[in-house]
Amino acid sequence: MVRKNQEWPDEGELIIGTVYKVLNYGAFAKLEEYHGKEAFIHISEVSSGWVKNIRDHVRENQKIVCRVLRVNPKKGHVDASLKRIREDQRTKKIQHWKIEQKAEKFLELSAKSLGKSLNDAYDEVGYELMDIFGDVYGAFETAADDGAKSLTDEGISQEWADAITEIANKNITPPEVHISGYVDIETFVPDGVDVIIEALKAAEDNGDEEEEIKVQCVGAPRYRITVKSTDYILAEKALKAAADRCIEIVEASEGNGSFLRELDS
């Protein structure tokens, strides 16, 4: 069960629950992110329309997303609403919850690699990761992108930072960014074909940089340059640099070149 770094939800917060009891006047749900806590949804908060039969809207064992209306820790009560949520908010909450379920599994794997339990992981590092990165998955993403040092710089122990980074590298694939631009190049020197070939090879030669660059002929004198990267800003820089390398060679041979980020429609 995904856990939160606080005992009770806040008013206005979206929560995930599993309905375990439905009565004529409302429904009760166990909260997935707050162990041992439950919420009550009054029939008036089930739907914005008239509810003739509450079971037409909610049933036992159903996963639901609610908005917290009131919290009374002394009485152990959480009142919630099903109707005060937009569909996009409901979808986003469910997606985030599923991601955090995955993150908890990563945390458990990290703990096992150290001979520890999931409870140990939460107590020693899990709640701290939530405070620092917003959620556990955010910590694993950071580790996958920037390495263990990104965790130790925030005060996470080297032991946990290494374990988390190892699991992150095995399970999180960096997102790919694909962008394209165009170069128009031409030269009329006798060895012009060789010049163009050299220019296109220069565009694709990215040295030791990680960005992958490919050039395709759209129809002479126009060529498409495509860049694949894990970072949009780096991709843009690589695209411009590739175009500049290409144009520089053509212009050095008494030719002309220009870069177009996008084509006119």
Swiss-Prot record:
Regions annotated as coiled coil: none
GO molecular-function term, one example from the UniProt record: RNA binding
Subunit comment: Heterotrimer composed of an alpha, a beta and a gamma chain.
Domain S1 motif: 12-83
Keyword Ribonucleoprotein carried by entry: no
CDD domains: S1_IF2_alpha
Family to which the UniProt record says this protein belongs: Belongs to the eIF-2-alpha family.
Claim: Translocase is one of the keywords in the record: no
Function: eIF-2 functions in the early steps of protein synthesis by forming a ternary complex with GTP and initiator tRNA.
InterPro entries hit by this protein: NA-bd_OB-fold (IPR012340), S1_domain (IPR003029), S1_IF2_alpha (IPR044126), TIF2_asu_arc (IPR022964), TIF2_asu_C (IPR024055), TIF2_asu_middle_sf (IPR024054), TIF_2_asu (IPR011488)
SUPFAM superfamilies, A to Z: eIF-2-alpha, C-terminal domain, eIF2alpha middle domain-like, Nucleic acid-binding proteins
Keywords of this entry: Initiation factor, Protein biosynthesis, RNA-binding
Organism per entry: Methanobrevibacter smithii (strain ATCC 35061 / DSM 861 / OCM 144 / PS)
Domain of life: Archaea
HAMAP family: eIF_2_alpha
Pfam families: EIF_2_alpha, S1
SMART domains associated with the record: S1
Name of this chain's protein: Translation initiation factor 2 subunit alpha
